[in-house]
Amino acid sequence: MNKDNTVFVGNKPVMNYVLAVVTQFSNGATEVIIKARGKAISRAVDTGEIALNRFLEGVRKKEIITSTEEIETDSGKTNVSSIEIVLTNVPL
């Protein structure tokens, strides 16, 4: 898996990330990973669903990975949820 095929979801509008995913597949990628942490997780899920249902034919969800990351803040360590959604256009 090439790191260039990873879309990191943040606070921008969802369609920006959808365009990034569609562009990766248009450029010949066989897999694209959508990653997000914390409050951006719902935006990542929206990105994957919009890309699959409205723009990409023959692409499917390969894997969804959820985890918890421990990050250092000013007030100490805190846990942040994260998600990785792997999309692929390789047939089953």
From Swiss-Prot:
Keywords noted in UniProt: Chromosome, Cytoplasm, DNA condensation, DNA-binding
Organism (species): Methanosphaerula palustris (strain ATCC BAA-1556 / DSM 19958 / E1-9c)
Any Pfam family the entry gives: Alba
Family stated for the protein in its record: Belongs to the histone-like Alba family.
Subcellular location: Cytoplasm; Chromosome
Gene: albA
GO biological process: one example: chromosome condensation
InterPro entries to which the protein is assigned, alphabetical: Alba-like_dom_sf, DNA/RNA-bd_Alba, DNA/RNA-bd_Alba-like
GO CC annotation terms, alphabetical: chromosome; cytoplasm
Described purpose of this protein according to its UniProt entry: Binds double-stranded DNA tightly but without sequence specificity. Involved in DNA compaction.
Protein's name in the database: DNA/RNA-binding protein Alba
GO molecular function per UniProt: double-stranded DNA binding; RNA binding
Predominant location: cytoplasm
